[in-house]
């Protein structure tokens, strides 16, 4: 999955293991010799790739600003620690311009809800619905859950397309 440069979203609630999962993905990506651009506002991710550029979003240089700069840095993979707001649209656009293999985290209640959360985040900066953009950019959603002091992968889905006639996403389970 990583060598085929699928875009992966690690989704789940607080303490579900999203960041730990992303760090495991980064450990594997680091073996591939790709240029990784890592963007975070809170430093939590570790990337041992030989060619890793880390960017920090701040109050004066936003996540959106970082994403606008990243395309000039010839990234092989764009990784964002956590998507929370309107920067989701800039990230989806970056992933949709030939920069596959990226990953990020999103807080959500299940894999399908992750898509709704992305729609809501992009709606903060665009009046146009972004379902087709989401379906073009995102390939895999890994939903993690924390229950009873354990963290586990509860669901893995592959997003196939946005069907405008049916007004729904088409995806299948990889569990």
State where each predicted segment sits.
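Conserved P-loop NTPase
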Residues: 135-175
């Amino acid at each position: 999955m990583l060598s085929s440069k699928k875009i992966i979203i690690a989704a789940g609630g607080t303490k579900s293991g999203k960041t730990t999962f992303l760090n495991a993905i980064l450990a594997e990506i680091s073996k591939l010799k790709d240029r990784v651009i890592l963007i975070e506002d809170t430093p939590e991710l570790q990337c041992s790739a030989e060619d890793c550029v880390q960017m920090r979003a701040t109050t004066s240089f936003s996540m959106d600003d970082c994403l606008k700069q990243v395309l000039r840095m010839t990234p092989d993979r764009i990784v964002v620690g956590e998507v929370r707001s309107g920067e989701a649209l800039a990230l989806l656009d970056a992933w949709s311009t030939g920069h596959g293999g990226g990953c990020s985290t999103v807080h959500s209640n299940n894999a399908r809800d992750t898509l709704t959360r992305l729609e809501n985040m992009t709606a903060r900066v665009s009046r146009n619905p972004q379902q087709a953009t989401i379906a073009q950019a995102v390939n895999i959603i890994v939903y993690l859950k924390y229950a009873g002091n354990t963290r586990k992968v509860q669901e893995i889905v592959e997003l196939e397309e946005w069907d405008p006639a049916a007004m729904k996403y088409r995806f299948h389970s990889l569990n």
